[in-house]
Amino acid sequence: MLYEVQFLSYNQRDQVQGWIYVPAAKPKGIVQLVHGFGEHSRRYLKMIVQYLDADYIVAADDHVGHGKTAIVNNNSWGDWGDKGFHTMMEDEHSLHDLVVEKYPDLPYFLYGHSMGSFIVRDYMSKYGDELAGATICGTTGVWPDLEKGIQILEQDVA
């Protein structure tokens, strides 16, 4: 079963577009997908099907400035509004609350890819006690030449 959901974004400007996918069998838990920059949640349909086949509910939305949320709100791609990154994290929490209202007794997991991994990290620092776990995928690591690049930029700006 598929439910389409909408909710007012934390930015008080946009209607976030989301989906709740429910398996045919009794669900074992919930996985909320948090997509990356320039993506949309339906990019993950193959993964969603795998979770459904494993009897997990999947929740996903398109961030402000992304996918169907940007289209419905007539926004430019990447227009997050004020406090964009924080807005996306709080919007993920709003989706969590919608799902938990329907399915209150299931373990809840977040899966964040790329920029979504940073949103999940921020989420865990504030709401981590609401989660059974999280997967952080495609995140950044140490860049050995980053310090050198910063020094070059500082010299150019000075």
Can you say where each PLM-predicted feature lies in the sequence?
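Alpha/beta-hydrolase fold nucleophile elbow
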Residues: 103-114
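Alpha/beta-hydrolase-fold enzymes
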Residues: 120-158
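Proline/glycine-enriched tight loop/beta-turn segments at coil->beta junctions
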Residues: 14, 22-30, 56
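Glycine-rich nucleophile elbow surrounding the catalytic serine of serine-hydrolase chemistry
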Residues: 112-122
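Alpha/beta-hydrolase active-site loop
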Residues: 80-100
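Active-site glycine-rich loops that stabilize anionic/oxyanionic intermediates
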Residues: 35-39
